[in-house]
Amino acid sequence: MKKLIAAALLGILSIAHIIAQEKSKPNVLFIAVDDLKPVLGCYGDKIIKTPNIDRLAKMGTVFLNNYCQQAVCGPTRASLLTGMRPDVTKIRDLHTKMRDINPNIVTLPEYFISQGYTTSGIGKIFHPSCVDKKFDPQSWSIPFLVAKESDYSNGLPVQKHYQSPELKALNAKEEVLTAQDGKGKKKSKKEADDEEGARGPAFECLDLPDDSYDDGVSAKLAVKQIEMLNAAKKPFFMAVGFRKPHLPFVSPKKYWDLYKREDMPVAEFQEHAANSKIFSYQYPGELTNYSGVKEFAKFDKNEANEFGLAIDKQKELVHAYYAAVSYTDAQVGILLNTLEKLGTLNNTIIVLWGDHGWHLGDHDMWGKHTNYEQATKAPLIIAAPGLKAGQTKSMTEFVDVFPTLCELSGGKVPAYLDGKSLVPVMKNNKTSVKEYAMSQYPRKMDKADINKVEDGKGKLMGYSMRTEQYRYTVWLKNFTSDQAYSADKVYTKELYDYDKDPLEKVNVSDDKKYAEIAADLDKKLVAYFKSKEVKL
């Protein structure tokens, strides 16, 4: 009998020990922000109002030289959330589904499930068209949160974005989405959305509460979820995905009122770089899908990828973007305040990231979708219990987030991950774990060259190596890094020296003064390709 009692007591103590171990693990608050470039106070922007993200920055490490793997939502999110590059995930577009290609791939939330965490999410975490059921159900140990109409203080937004009474009236009459195509045939919603100017205005400014729009609702529901998770016995991984400042730039009027239109900055350099190829730029088709923009540009869609947006319209769009950033910043503050109120702020790893940058007029571009600095550079802030706050200029990239969170939470870092843990950098901001970051983007050759290639398609993949001083981009024909590299695949190259040319005005890849530098960077890039080649 005594033995049975002793055994039972031992079992109870063992269970209690396991529960105590689990509860002692830090929680994780994982904040994704759609299309957020580093226009933040903590990144040196003197105009933007982001007090809450700046507050987070004072708690953690600000990675000043952080880059995405591919400057478009689906691929960059897939890479960050798996710790694998686009040529491994095979997500290089906005329609390939991650598990159709890699059914057994382990996502970051799945990893935390294996470590005894409860994982929960709301908002845009994965790109919805690149995963099953829009949010990858197996990544979440409890059902992914989806807002209902009753969660919005002003009813569901029209076309998922707008609260304008005029647009709501139009929508009710189906005047927007059932336009005729000239042949008496009604267009599908997708066809209507894909037309220039068919998606409604590029921005909205109305005097409404925060929870009239998606991000205010997401913050409100996330607070309730965090309170529920915190009361449980297990550590939690809570992912909150904010949709602004993605187009359309909608936000309540009070955030617009933080700024004066005349103070809004416009890009200093609004031309294509000398010696560059036309194909490497992007006509702002995403922007012109919204109304009220195209008529203010000098050029319609053209082979030269020119746009020429009027300065007043540029300032208006920048104003709208900044207001949307401040709106999202306020929601971040709500999450931080919730953790503080619950007494768990000091036991929570907090990571905030914008999935890529955004061209706000530089190089005559508006959007992402390139290998240039303004598209590939993205904010990353990580705060963790026991680590001092600071900033670092060390080169980092989004594939590093997965292994970093593994180590910070006390877990083992999977050996197969493409990234490296940034914990050494967080402990010593002068150190570095890598020499360069790598981005990539698919394109097609300039039209004059497409007819010269056998398949008539002219597909290219541009691999862009960003070191502390240089960006070296090599455009390769019908090539991805899981294939065997050969020099005859090279179509063209770009090289930019940020010490002398921070605005990327001149491609110096053929400049004899840079021959030695280009050769050294090329050697590094070829070594990278060799390391990624899949041996058959």
Where are these regions (language model features)?
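Formylglycine-dependent sulfatase
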Residues: 2-9, 13-487, 491, 502-527
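Short hydrophobic beta-strand that contains or immediately precedes a catalytic carboxylate
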Residues: 495-496
